[in-house]
Amino acid sequence: MRKNKIFIRVDSGTKVGYGHLIRCLALAEYLQKDWKINFISRSLPGNIIHELEIKKFQVFRLKSNSNRMNQKNDAEKSISLIKKYGGEKNLVIVDNYELSKQWETHVKPYVKKLIVIDDLMNRKHYCDLIIDQNLHTKMNGLYEGL
């Protein structure tokens, strides 16, 4: 049976840290029984992308000339990979503080569901679901308007 695919857009490196990638790796290990997991990640200085490859996940490396991200360009590269290697029922999970509604607006038409992992609540999103693993005392309405 052919598995549906998940594309996880996450970065790691000396400036952005490693927590996002480690969190997504744990999620991918859980989901891989029922889904084909693919990672999309920039090759930033000090990245730990090799941790994904050690676990036998498909990794698509986006070239990065600097630590500054162009969301539209990043979205176009991600869409190209999703169209080339995905199917009809793709799911995208994004865990990246540098990506927001601008990136999501470009990507969403090409996927069945778009899920954002965000715990900052400091930028607008255009997605089907926001996951915040933190416990907040007042969860109701916390993400309204984002």
Enumerate the predicted regions with their spans.
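Extreme N-terminal starter segment of soluble prokaryotic enzymes
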Residues: 2-7
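Active-site and donor-binding regions of nucleotide-sugar-utilizing enzymes
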Residues: 9-18, 23-30, 42-145
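A generic structural motif
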Residues: 32-38
